[in-house]
Regions:
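Short, acidic loop-to-helix structural element flanking the phosphoryl-transfer center
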Residues: 28-55, 86-91, 260-265, 269
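Substrate-recognition "cap/lid" segment bordering the active-site pocket of phosphatases
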Residues: 62-110, 116, 120, 315-317
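Active-site neighborhood of HAD-like aspartate-dependent phosphohydrolases
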Residues: 1-49
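Active-site-facing substrate-recognition patch
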Residues: 175-262, 302-330
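PRPP/pyrophosphate-binding module of the type I phosphoribosyltransferase fold
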Residues: 124-130, 135, 306-381
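Basic, low-complexity terminal or inter-domain segments flanking catalytic cores
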Residues: 379-422
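Substrate-recognition element of Asp-dependent hydrolases with the DxDx(T/V) motif
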Residues: 10, 40-69, 77-83, 122
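Acidic, Mg2+-coordinating phosphoryl-transfer loop and its flanking beta/alpha structural elements
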Residues: 112-159
Length: 422
């Protein structure tokens, strides 16, 4: 496997602004002053022993990057890559015939890095990405997203790693280490999730977790927007629903392994009576296998009008849910802990409103689990007819992808050009 490794913040603990003059090539770096993350050299050596080819992929100046790559790690490097622009990386791939040949199968490649830029360039190359979390940022960098939590997560890395051992585990068995629902569609069982949010309330907490990515635009092949849209397909199969439920069950088995947290109820966000197909979430929920006590806690008002999907922003979505979706009365929730399952996490309006309703009922701990979460869009191809950016769309009926130059009829400003993706 070709393993592209970010340098600063991934192999070297040099994300701090003190290192900027060296990374920019203004000052010469003394290698004695380059702090390596514990185990970095051994990690690179282990990759090579196992037959992998590590290559440093860095935005920093070649004078800085090459010195570290050659004298500390003894591996090749690409510098001044201009992440997330993939052009220079593609030029490197295409200029090396053996690497170019491997690139025909994107499973031969992976990118490891600590910022959303590493994730985005990986998505543009359609290869898997590992977002590392090896240090706590001392300041926020707007461009790299260093010190921010939400943007790297919303960019949609394939994997997350807190140590080099985590990265090695991913490289050794990449399909097994996918998110729970992404893994199930590769015939693997995984209990992995995205830790999207955690809020502490004086010893009580609310946590949001997501089990698969809903891609928008370029991405690695393991993100499953096609499967999300399949939920709404009236012709969806029982096998498909069973796989979704199994992915949820696999994650809940992980939750059950923490006896310090006692969960009283497992519930779900029910569907409106007008939803098609009807009771889609209940059908999934009924197939989820867990030891938690299942219960229905939410229902929509009979007079609900409109659709949450058509609301333009977080505020409008939150107001819609607060008006029409209610926690059922008559069930004592005071001091209880509740797990809630929903199909999608986008703006977080549903998760936040439901969490607030449960807290108003006295609920102690809340675990909100979304089957899919919508990641940030990436557009990288221009329309051959009008030059505007093409969007990758998915046919809800069969899950096939296609490029679309969205016309005004569908909320865009393009010419309507369509191109199938093989």
């Amino acid at each position: 496997m070709i393993v592209f490794l970010d340098l600063d913040g991934t192999l070297t603990n040099t994300a701090h602004e003190w290192f900027k003059p060296f990374k920019d090539g203004i000052q010469e770096i003394d290698l004695n002053n380059v702090p390596l993350f514990n185990g970095a050299k051994q990690f690179v050596e282990d990759l090579q022993k196992e037959g992998h080819r590590p290559i440093i992929l860095s935005d920093s100046h070649p004078k800085y990057v090459n010195k570290i790559a050659q004298q500390i790690f003894q591996i090749p490097a690409i510098s001044l890559t201009d992440k997330p622009n993939a052009e220079k990386t593609l030029n490197y791939i295409n200029s090396n015939p053996d690497i170019q040949q491997l690139f025909s199968d994107k499973d031969n490649f992976i990118i490891v890095g600590d910022s959303w830029l590493d994730v985005e360039i990986g998505r543009r190359l359609n290869i898997r990405t590992v977002l590392t979390q090896f240090y706590k940022a001392s300041s926020i960098e707007e461009r790299d997203g260093i010190g921010q939590d939400w943007k790297p997560i919303k960019m949609g890395a394939t994997y997350y790693a807190k140590s080099f051992d985590d990265v090695k585990k991913i490289i050794q068995n990449p399909n097994k280490e996918l998110l729970a629902i992404e893994a199930i569609f590769q015939n693997e069982n995984s209990d992995n999730m995205v830790r999207f949010l955690y809020r502490n309330y004086n010893g009580e907490f609310t946590a949001f977790r997501c089990l698969a990515r809903q891609d928008d635009g370029e991405c690695d092949k393991f993100a499953r927007a096609d499967k999300y849209y399949q939920i709404d397909n009236p012709e969806r199969s029982h096998d498909f629903i069973s796989k979704l439920a199994q992915g949820v069950s696999n994650y809940l088995s992980r939750v059950e392994k923490f006896p310090q947290y006692q969960w009283d109820y497992l519930t779900y966000v029910s569907d409106k009576k007008t939803t098609s197909p009807p009771n889609k979430m209940k059908e999934i929920f009924d197939l989820v296998n867990s030891n938690f006590n299942k219960i229905k806690l939410f229902e929509w008002s009979e007079d609900v009008e409109g659709s949450l999907r058509n609301k333009p922003n977080y505020k409008a979505r939150r107001e819609f849910i607060a008006k029409y979706l209610k926690t059922i009365d008559g069930i004592d929730l005071n001091g209880k802990s509740v797990i809630v399952i929903d199909d999608q996490f986008t703006s977080s309006a549903t998760a936040n409103e439901i969490s607030q309703q449960l807290r108003n009922k006295g609920v102690k701990n809340i675990l909100f689990v979304a089957l899919f979460y919508l990641i940030l869009p990436i557009e990288s191809k221009a329309c051959p007819q009008c030059g505007k950016s093409l969007k990758i769309k998915i046919k809800r009926k069969d899950g096939n992808r296609f490029y679309s130059c969205l016309s005004p009829q569908f909320g865009g400003q393009g010419c309507g050009y369509i191109e199938n993706i093989n």
